[in-house]
Amino acid sequence: MRRFALIAAGLATVAAAGCSSSSSSTPRSGSSPATGTITVFAAASLTEAFTKIGQQFQAAHKGDTAKFSFGPSSGLATQITSGAPADVFASASPGTMQDVVSAGDASNPQNFAKNFAEVAVPPNNPANVDSVTDLAKHSVKVALCQPQVPCGSVAAEVFKNAGITVKPVTLQPDVKSVLTQVETGNVDAGMVYVTDVMAAGSKAKGITIPASDNASTLYPMATVSSSNHKSIAQQFVAYVLSPAGQQVLAAAGFQKP
């Protein structure tokens, strides 16, 4: 009898432990991952806007977290197609997004913003740059994005429209790196986006490019096919497209696509 009681008690303990384990491991309703964390790969030019959108998203979706990896769109695309864990990809170029879609790593991208090029110079404008054509002068030290990066492609289009040839002293991996070159005074000018000049504040000054010479780029976004957090990823995409997300983008200088 005593042996039976001990066995019964042991079974009761196991059953209780099993119920406790099942309860604690059950994910929240409507959320596939237990942690509620997504990783967003986003173009460097989205740094300020997406950081704020992420904060608002988390406030509106308690328990969910958005972590960001900002960088050159082409580099982020290569990481995704090489198997890097990501849940959302926001590119500064439809072409770069198409590379990811063609590889089967994303589908149904949606354009959520548009950006235009602008010349950035140090606050004191040491080279007296007044227009984009001044970048063709040999005396002006210019920083550009690498040609395969969206901001590099946009700059090339601007130069073609303006009928000038620019020989940069440095090629940078992304637009924020170009802006840093300007802010630190390493160069006299850099080709960035309107949003980057706004984000720089007093650290840089913008030189407007005439509409006839300027070029723009669209920003598409999609969930990554291999995501284990598709529900939250789709909610984040929806938030960026929502009036709240669009308001943040507009305040940062982005235009509607």
Stretch-by-stretch model annotation:
Residues 12-13, 97:
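Alpha-helical transmembrane segments and their juxtamembrane interfaces
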Residues 19-59, 65, 74, 78-81, ...:
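Exported/periplasmic ABC-transporter solute-binding proteins
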Residues 104, 108-110:
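Central helical "cap/lid" subdomain
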